[in-house]
Amino acid sequence: LEKAVDRLFIEADRAYRDGANILILSDRGVDDNHVAIPSLLAVSALQQYLVKTKKRTSLSLILESGEPREVHHFATLLGFGASAINPYLALDTVKQLIDEHMLDKDYYAAVDDYNHAIITGIVKIAAKMGISTIQSYQGSKIFEALGIDKDVIDKYFTNTVSRIGGISIKDIENDVNTLHSAAYDPLGLETDVTLDSKGRHKMRSGADAHLYNPATIHLLQQSTKRGDYEMFKQYTSLVDEEEKHTNLRGLMDFEYPKKGVKLEEVESVDSIVTRFKTGAMSYGSISKEAHETLAIAMNHLHGKSNTGEGGEDKDRLTVGPDGKNRCSAIKQVASGRFGVPSRYLTSAQEIQIKMAQGAKPGEGGHLPGKKVYPWIARTRLSTPGVSLISPPPHHDIYSIEDLEQLIFDLKNANRDARISVKLVSEAGVGTVAAGVAKAGAQVVLISGYDGGTGAAPSSSIHNAGLPWELGLAETHQTLIMNGLRNKVRIETDGKLMSGKDVAIAACLGAEEFGFATAPLVTMGCVMMRVCNLDTCPVGVATQNPELRKRFHGKPEYVINFMRFIAQEMREYMAKLGIHTVDELVGRSDLLVQKHYPEGSRESKIDMSRILNNPYALPESHEKMHFVPEDVFDFKLDQTIDETVIIPEMKEALAKKQKKRIEINVSNLNRALGTLFGAEITRKYYNNLEDDTFVIKCNGSGGQSFGAFIPVSYTHLT
């Protein structure tokens, strides 16, 4: 393969000398005796060669290949240098679908639809990266490689980030030969060029491994339903076996000391589960029944459930007549600000600013119009039947200073709530997290790429974001280096499925842990992946009243799952000689890379950036986890609300009397009125008349003047 790529360079030089200005790379010549060079390798290698020899601006690079078929394929080919792409096999497949009457459409119309879908996906990817023209995107190499050797990167994908090493050019050659042999029998006895599904998008027997498969789903549901811990251990045993081949933590193991501690000496299940949270799944994306079941379960455990970005029905903000607390402890604030009035914020124990989403990095939320039923629209303060899309960036955040302002606003809106910022695991997230900590956030959430969202297109889910193991380790280490680790809690999520997963996350720096897909599975989710279509057959991810009748989940199932995870985590802690979760946080020295046979693919992965943390020693442990006394001081006692407005209005507020005052303000008075507005909301919600409290402001108020104030409170300027 290496010689074949070198031959490409020679042929390109010859064509250039002969006066060619367009080079076409084609794999149509594949037959019994000719194996194709992988299209991305060919394009990127030739691009790098032409750039180095200063010929690229004189030549266009066109690819004719049967490989590209999905949005990501086209995006990487363009990003690594292709000028144009002819996906002939994808187009032949469209024709075959029409010929076999599986697609009732004119060929040219069908091809046009296919092209439109691909182009829309490419444009979306470019937009996520802040790029507005395809010319700027071509050759930009804005990717990170996972599992590719440094020599391959340096020679063929120059300057592309690749942090964990991986397969060599020889391994790639072996893969190509294996695929070729499957189509063309080496003995010449049989030729079978039909395409085979690898089960990448949906589970297929004998194809790609999926962590959630019929066996694991059955064991998880039955064990949590019955409260059977031994059956749950069967589930985690299967998961741990599958993880060996599917994610980075599967390549790690614990380095146990000669002597552990007794299980009774380890932090209790009741204490550990308070660190657990459910993921940000909005009311609208999942059903009322599913959303409330999660809240009831987590409140029972003294953990935290998350509203997602869809607001929360006001009837849930107080304990119901049945004595159950359906109020989500975490209230999310996303770029669309759907359903974020003052009462929503004042009812929170934690307010989460969603800067990004692990399951679809670079994109905002999207609730299709068919799922925006009247009751959803009412909660989100929107219009029934109209799709709700959160823009990828927050319209008011373009710097750390802007983020600091929003954090300050939200702290004023609820002085008792922790402020959390959700980030995606990606290269450089540690630097961003350091800025977030300096801006005053009390929790930083690092969200991994393989958290599941059924409400996003596959191009948004696959090949976007990175494993939480990389982002978490980077964030933890960067915060320590900047003297900020003790000021913030670190949380992580992204397909945490077992006590071992959680223990590894703690060793890499996490203090709190989020679960989303697993709790849904315990409530009945069967991974149909039709969440966005409003057709969920088990009533979990639908607003259809008839389908919701099929929901049979119970809080007890989620409670059992969380307690089982904590119990299994305790067992690992006992073997490691660890008494509390705080002792475990950041102890990457307790993790080792598993040993694999020399030359195997697993042996080529380099985990040193994740595991070799110079601060991961017990004696340096003081600043390695959150210290409550070191939390950011917002100096709320010095605000104009605390020093002037609340003292002036205190008696009128207590007696519900109308009152008007006049004050002098300046642009130093940020979030003016927000603290007092929160006091009104806590005491009376929206049950006071308009203009009950009026403040005449002389001068110019600062940023976020009157943010989140209720209707009974008015500022006059």
Label the predicted regions.
Residues 9-26, 32, 48, 52, ...:
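Alpha/beta enzyme core
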Residues 48, 52-92, 96-143, 148-150, ...:
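Phosphate/diphosphate-binding loops
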Residues 1, 74, 105-330, 348, ...:
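Flexible, glycine-rich loop/tail regions that form catalytic "lids" or insertion modules at the edges
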Residues 714-717:
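Conserved small/polar residues in nucleotide/adenosyl-binding loops
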Residues 1-5, 62-68, 281-287, 393-396, ...:
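Active-site mouth loops of central-metabolism enzymes
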Residues 21-27, 88-93, 301-318, 420, ...:
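Glycine-rich phosphate/pyrophosphate-binding loops
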Residues 676, 682-686, 703-709:
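Short, T/G/N/S-enriched strand-turn elements that build extracellular solenoid repeat scaffolds
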